[in-house]
């Protein structure tokens, strides 16, 4: 290898070792349609092997944000990859797409093969959960841009849907009901506020277990984002889903209206689902207003589906038969934005 490059902070051999370690994780994500193997200049996928008549590709890209800072502090890297996949596949899912393949971009300050393997292991886990093939990626060593212990990760998902089965929200009307799917906690949004409230201001310790939790705070915060692909796709195939929203940055306030036609609003029945204790914990320590909480966090609901009233029972039954926790959380009305129990939050 080039000693000059190594002296500049780039260890090519460590990069090769990282690729060698990740191959077994990539291998377990293979699915119908994948062509070639890891290491080519581009990942290949043969769409003709699938039974779509008028396929439309739907793509999405996202990252994990400052949740990474907690992974650095905890030296725990095996779940961040799940987050990267979840943030992307849940987005393409919101239009009714079946995720096909995924690529990751990992930028590191120093190539640590063990740490990189842990990250990619999480990516592979997320791909398995979503039925995606991990067909490629990039690991870039960037000394001087990141410290030796830092990294950033982003993901890219491509999915497919039949052209006449894409879920656009256009069919949503006044009277549609809203089904909420439970989140696992914070997912991957709002962590700049989380860190300010709990670590900077309250000076809490990530390794300490606080009431009402049964594990250290850091582990509670690093709980990976839920992936909704398999249960939601089962419901989508019924043709009874008219709109979907992935509740990410901006919480209820920003994300639910994204699926609604102009002139319609969402009325949410506050209290119709259990809110995980991490949210009240945050609200108490940060003295945060309720509107701030719903404008930043998912508040226990990570995905929302809009259905006609006559389809409610069937759709919830399908979701629950796939192990999903589904709640009737509200309805669509005339107006704009989101209201809670008839009171607008600003």
Curated annotation (Swiss-Prot):
The enzyme's E.C. designation: 6.3.3.1
Keywords for the protein's UniProt record, in alphabetical order: ATP-binding, Cytoplasm, Ligase, Nucleotide-binding, Purine biosynthesis
GO MF entry, a single one: phosphoribosylformylglycinamidine cyclo-ligase activity
SUPFAM superfamilies named in the record: PurM C-terminal domain-like, PurM N-terminal domain-like
Catalytic activity entry: 2-formamido-N(1)-(5-O-phospho-beta-D-ribosyl)acetamidine + ATP = 5-amino-1-(5-phospho-beta-D-ribosyl)imidazole + ADP + phosphate + H(+)
Domain of life: Bacteria
Pathway terms, separated by semicolons: Purine metabolism; IMP biosynthesis via de novo pathway; 5-amino-1-(5-phospho-D-ribosyl)imidazole from N(2)-formyl-N(1)-(5-phospho-D-ribosyl)glycinamide: step 2/2
Keyword Zinc-finger: no
Gene: purM
HAMAP family to which the protein is assigned, alphabetical: AIRS (MF_00741)
Family membership: Belongs to the AIR synthase family.
InterPro entries referenced in this protein's UniProt entry, alphabetically: PurM-like_C_dom, PurM-like_C_sf, PurM-like_N, PurM-like_N_sf, PurM_cligase
GO cellular component: cytosol
GO biological process: 'de novo' IMP biosynthetic process; adenine biosynthetic process; purine nucleotide biosynthetic process
Record keyword Nucleotide-binding present: yes
PANTHER family associated with the record: TRIFUNCTIONAL PURINE BIOSYNTHETIC PROTEIN ADENOSINE-3, TRIFUNCTIONAL PURINE BIOSYNTHETIC PROTEIN ADENOSINE-3-RELATED
Name this polypeptide is given: Phosphoribosylformylglycinamidine cyclo-ligase
Cited Pfam families: AIRS, AIRS_C
Localization per Swiss-Prot or TrEMBL: Cytoplasm
């Amino acid at each position: 290898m080039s000693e000059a490059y190594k002296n500049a902070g780039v260890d090519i051999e460590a990069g090769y070792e990282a690729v060698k370690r990740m191959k077994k994780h990539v291998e377990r994500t293979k699915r119908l349609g994948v062509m070639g193997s890891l290491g080519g200049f581009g990942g290949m996928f043969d769409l003709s092997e699938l039974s779509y008549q008028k396929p439309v590709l739907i793509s999405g890209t996202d990252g994990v944000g400052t949740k990474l800072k907690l992974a650095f502090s905890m030296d725990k890297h095996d779940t961040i990859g799940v987050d990267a996949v979840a943030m992307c596949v849940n987005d393409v899912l919101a239009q009714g797409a079946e995720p096909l393949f995924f690529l990751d971009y990992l930028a590191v300050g120093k190539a640590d093969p063990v740490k990189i393997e842990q990250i990619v292991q999480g990516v592979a886990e997320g791909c398995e959960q979503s039925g995606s093939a991990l067909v490629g990626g990039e690991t870039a060593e960037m000394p001087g841009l990141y410290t030796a212990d830092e990294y950033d990760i982003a993901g890219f998902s491509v999915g497919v849907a039949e052209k006449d089965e894409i879920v656009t929200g256009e069919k949503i009307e006044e009277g549609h009901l809203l089904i909420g799917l439970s989140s696992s906690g914070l997912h991957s949004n709002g962590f700049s506020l989380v860190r300010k409230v709990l670590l900077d201001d309250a000076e809490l310790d990530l390794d300490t277990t606080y009431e009402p939790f049964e594990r250290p705070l850091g582990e509670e915060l690093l709980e990976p984002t839920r992936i909704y692909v398999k249960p939601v796709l089962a419901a989508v195939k019924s043709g009874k889903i008219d709109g979907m929203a992935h509740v990410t940055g901006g919480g209820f306030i920003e994300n639910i209206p994204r699926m609604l036609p102009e002139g319609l609003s969402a009325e949410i029945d506050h209290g119709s689902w259990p809110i995980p204790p991490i949210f009240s914990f945050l609200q108490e320590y940060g003295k945060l207003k309720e509107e701030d909480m719903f404008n930043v966090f998912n508040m226990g609901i990570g995905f929302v589906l809009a259905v006609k009233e006559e389809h409610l029972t069937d759709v919830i039954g399908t979701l629950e038969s796939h192990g999903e926790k589904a709640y009737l959380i509200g309805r669509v009305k005339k107006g704009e934005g989101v209201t809670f129990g008839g009171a607008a939050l600003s």
